[in-house]
Amino acid sequence: MLGLGTLFLLLAACPASRADPVPALPDIQVQENFNESRIYGKWFNLAVGSTCPWLSRIKNKMSMSTLVLREGATGAEISTTSTRWRRGVCEEVSGTYEKTDMDGKFLYHKSKWNVTLESYVVHTNYDEYAIFLTKKFSRHHGPTITAKLYGREPQLRDSLLQEFREVALSVGIPENSIVFMEDRGECVPGDLEQKSTSLLRARRAVLPQENEGSGTGPLVTDVLKKEDSCQLSYSEGPCLGMIEKYYYNGASMACETFHYGGCLGNGNNFNSEKECLQTCRTVAACSLPIVQGPCRAYVELWAFDAAQGKCVQFSYGGCKGNGNKFYSEKECKEYCGVPGDGYEELTRS
C-alpha cells in the first residue's frame, strides 16, 4: 500500500500546479458511528487516487501491499505497520497516527517538512472494506487530497471498487489519477523479488530463511563495498523526497530510520532493517541486551542471551531494538560463536 512512508513521499513532493490550481479541499464526513476497535487488524491496500500530479509518474510501479493497525503506545495513538514491495525489496515501515476529538479522523505531522496529514475513515463495514481520505496542507505546495481503498482480502467485489471510484471523483480526484494496484503477492520484510537480480549489485544479498547465516558469503562490489559505508553518518541528500530508509548507527549498534531525499547521499542507506543489520552488524552485538522495543508487531526473531550463553527466541515489537536481533537461529549461532546443535548432548553431565 501507500503506507506512511510512501504516502508521505507522494504528498510532500507534490506541488500545486499553477496552470490548474487545486481547489479548496472539501469538508469530509467520517463513517457514521465509527468504531475504532473494529478498524484494527490487517488490511490490503487495493487502490489509490490523488489530486497530486506526481502520482502519474509512479503509478506503474505501485503494487498491492498490507497495513496492520493496532492500539498505540498511548491511548491517544494508533500504531501502523505497512509492508510492501519497493524497488524489488520487501520493506516494512512503522508509524503512528494521532487520534483527534473526531472519531475516525487521525493526524500525522512532520515538523521538519512543515507538513500535516489529516486522514479520515469515510466508508467501511469493518469486515470487508474501508475507504480513507487524506488531506495534506503545506505552505510550500498547497493542498492535496488522496483516497485509498483497503480490503480485508486481496480482492473485493466490483460494487465496492465502483464505490471507491465515485468517492474519489466526488472530492476532485481525476479519473486518470485513480490506480488499482497490481497484486504481486504478500512479502516478508527483507526478501527480494525473484526478478530483481540487478539489486544484488553493490549490496549484500539477503539470504532465504532456510540458508540464512551471517551473510559472510561473496559480496558483489561496484566501486565501494557496502560495509565500508557502515560507519558514515546517514545522508538525506539534496533532493526533497521523503523515502523512509535505514542506516547503521555505530554508537547504538542498531539500524535506525531516516528520510532519504531520493538522490545522492552515501552508502549507509538500506531498504530494510534486515539488509542493514546483515551488512553492518558486528559480533559486538552479541553482548547487547535483548530489546523488544515499544512497538507491537510481535515478530518472532532470535537473539543471543549472554547469561545463558545461547541463542533464544523472542518477540520483537518492530521498532527501536538493537543489533542483537537475528532472523534465524543459524544466523545467531554463526555470529555469536555458539557450538553446533550436538554440543549440549556431548557435554551434558
From Swiss-Prot:
In the N-terminal section; belongs to the calycin superfamily. Lipocalin family. SMART domains: KU (SM00131). It comes from the Eukaryota. Gene3D superfamilies: 2.40.128.20, Pancreatic trypsin inhibitor Kunitz domain (4.10.410.10). This is Protein AMBP. Residues 230-280, 286-336 form the BPTI/Kunitz inhibitor domain. Its EC number is 1.6.2.-.
